[in-house]
Amino acid sequence: MRLAVNIDHIATLRNARGEQEPDPVAAALLAEKCGAAGIVCHLREDRRHINDHDLARLREAVTTKLDLEMAMTPELQQIALKTRPELITLVPEKREELTTEGGFDIVRHYAVLAAYLKPFNAAGIEVSLFIEPEKKAIDLAKQAGADLVELHTGLYALKKEGEAQSKELQRIREAAIHARSLGLKVVAGHGLNYLNIAPFREIEEIEEVSIGHAIIARAVLTGLEEAIREMLRIIK
């Protein structure tokens, strides 16, 4: 299983003081050095952490895979096509939320989704949708032209250990199996941490996990390099 490191909260920490440090690009390079298979950043409409300049610098610096999370807006479509990350991930976005609260509502947006994705398909930029682990959403993602799905693991992360968490893990497993049967690549993310990630090693259909907050929080105490290496030790 591969690890993609989300460096948004490096920028959050920097922006808390309006300074230049810590530098998210430096964090991205260190993550790659430690063995991360990709770097994830979310260019939100309000630019609350990563900004346009960060994105441009990340594109120049990242040599593994740059995954740009973004809302489905015309402005961000143009920015993404100009920047040319290896992958874009469409996510829902609410200005009042602290972090992404759920999967992309593909049923609601399906009528316009395929047309929105076509320029990315034509440009050779892979497309992922951050969705709930549900078969209908996966089917629609495939039909709309997605190459990957990122399964939302937030509900799993919120469950206490026991039957409820096991049930949610099984739902994710079944969704991953279904997605792979359609030829989609599968990623998982949201709320995953050092204590709850281990069971995902048993779901072979999930090729990669995307983790940010847990790693950055651990890095405050142990350093970023050790925080990343510790996560890699758990998932390998």
Swiss-Prot record:
Binding site for 1-deoxy-D-xylulose 5-phosphate: 8-9, 44, 49, 99
GO cellular component, one term: cytosol
EC number: 2.6.99.2
Main location: cytoplasm
Protein keywords: Cytoplasm, Pyridoxine biosynthesis, Transferase
Keyword Transferase: yes
Cell location: Cytoplasm
Residues that bind 3-amino-2-oxopropyl phosphate: 6, 17, 191, 212-213
Site (described: Transition state stabilizer): 150
Catalytic activity: 3-amino-2-oxopropyl phosphate + 1-deoxy-D-xylulose 5-phosphate = pyridoxine 5'-phosphate + phosphate + 2 H2O + H(+)
Functional pathway: Cofactor biosynthesis; pyridoxine 5'-phosphate biosynthesis; pyridoxine 5'-phosphate from D-erythrose 4-phosphate: step 5/5
CDD domains linked to this entry: PNPsynthase (cd00003)
Annotated GO MF terms: pyridoxine 5'-phosphate synthase activity
NCBIfam families: pdxJ (TIGR00559), PRK05265.1-3 (NF003625), PRK05265.1-5 (NF003627)
Function as written in the Swiss-Prot or TrEMBL entry: Catalyzes the complicated ring closure reaction between the two acyclic compounds 1-deoxy-D-xylulose-5-phosphate (DXP) and 3-amino-2-oxopropyl phosphate (1-amino-acetone-3-phosphate or AAP) to form pyridoxine 5'-phosphate (PNP) and inorganic phosphate.
Record-stated family: Belongs to the PNP synthase family.
Quaternary data: Homooctamer; tetramer of dimers.
The protein, known as: Pyridoxine 5'-phosphate synthase
Organism per entry: Pelodictyon phaeoclathratiforme (strain DSM 5477 / BU-1)
Gene expressing this chain: pdxJ
